[in-house]
């Protein structure tokens, strides 16, 4: 037997799709994700497919998956301690950014703190013109001073992003050679190698994010490769890229910036394929997971692409499938604010403890609990037998909110669902729909992305 296996690792669940190349049939499996130990859910799934379907590790001849390790590293700010070398007098590139505030209607809204603090940003002497011609030679003494100060400040890696290096990387390459000679133990990352695009800030932040997540991603991929090999899986793991393509695990270790949005892209690519073979010209894919809901536009069977997708609090400027996300998924927590208004999300119960109805220690009502309290889930197999629904626990936590609101459990559960659906539609899907209507009068279809 020969199976092609696809694995989608989400914030709450990890889903397996197993395609039998001989019979052309599809099998599925769901396990809880392990954000505390990334990769453990993959090995658990490999074990369970053997128990449930009799598929042995040796039968897996193709293995690809999307991972959230990179994006979670940025969100949790657990990446490499970096220093940044910029062109002299341009130390504030990350501080100034594009001067946009997160909420344009809130004058108290604050921009996020950069991944590299200003005291770890060093200007070095040397300047290129806009056409790439050298204006001022690179000064080795200034590079040496920057290396010394970066090492003294505890830098674990150095990002070099100089003006106009997308036209001529000579100064960045020369600076890299100097750093490697002076501090061979410190890894160096170049903006011209990460993604050589015009505009200083966009190129710099993309290089910074790539360097920031690289050690954790590389460690994760190395561990996954070893674990799959030890389990007897002959296939070399592949990763989905942010643009919907695939890359090898070895490529992912050094080019992790290209797969940082791999999880969300996979669902859109799958939905686009279904739309194409179904003859649907224009549709919106909607991927509702445990933590978020992702909407994307598909036209003539093709997803739309762009740059500037959001990674945590920052934008990353690499080609990727255009996806709009809102923090409302099955595990999104319902709560009552100080004014007595019912809200849903963006905080999620995740996989641990998860919704109360999972019986894993959850004590706060979620969207899934609202469905369980109304009897809409839990009457048949849920999550391919990975989840057992306890409706009584769901009603108990929804009941706590009902008491605060002066409503019945049923009314409160229905309100939770209505708020979630309203948020998904008005905040994101409406914009996607508007994009479609701009190109055609035809109304779009909605395709589930998982």
Task: Enumerate the predicted regions with their spans.
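N-terminally biased helix-coil "hinge/interface" segments that flank
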Residues: 1-450
